């Protein structure tokens, strides 16, 4: 099977960071056909030009893909992400709302098409600790976040 180079990217907080990441994934013929996860730790080196120091982040993501063995060569994926954020700082002052802990279960459906592999994903983050978990002063605020993504991978 021929492999081609590709790039993964994400938006940044604007700080230079140390990033330590490890991944472990397995592929097999029976279900789950693909499973594993990654662990990433990000630690900011210094404040950016706006005097912002991003919080350290610890991210654990686990996933498993189950092939349906149907005529569309589709598969179902299940995942769980855990993200812990430390405190960020503006001008050396601790951000009161930057520390958090969230858990995000994910469901995905992948189907092969004439254009490539088409994936539909839905994720629901739950904030266990941090600013989105509590409502200080009962001021009628809150969050109800859903994430939807559609991706096309062409080989």
Regions from the PLM with identified roles:
Residues 1-53, 152:
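Outer-membrane pore/translocation modules
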Residues 49-155:
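Outer membrane beta-barrel transmembrane domains
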């Amino acid at each position: 099977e021929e492999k081609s180079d590709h790039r993964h990217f994400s938006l940044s907080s604007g700080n230079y960071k140390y990033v330590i990441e490890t991944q472990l994934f397995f592929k097999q013929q029976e279900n789950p056909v693909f499973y594993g996860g990654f662990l990433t730790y990000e630690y900011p080196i210094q404040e950016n030009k706006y005097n912002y120091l991003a919080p350290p982040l610890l991210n654990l993501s686990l996933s498993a893909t189950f092939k349906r063995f149907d005529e569309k060569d589709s598969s179902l994926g299940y995942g769980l992400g855990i993200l812990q954020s430390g405190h960020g700082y503006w001008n050396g002052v601790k951000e009161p709302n930057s520390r958090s802990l969230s858990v995000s279960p994910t469901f995905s459906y992948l189907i092969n098409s004439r254009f490539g592999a088409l994936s539909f994903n839905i994720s629901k983050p739950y904030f266990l600790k941090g600013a989105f978990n509590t409502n200080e002063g009962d001021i009628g605020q809150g969050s109800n976040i859903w994430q939807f993504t559609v991706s096309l991978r062409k080989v």
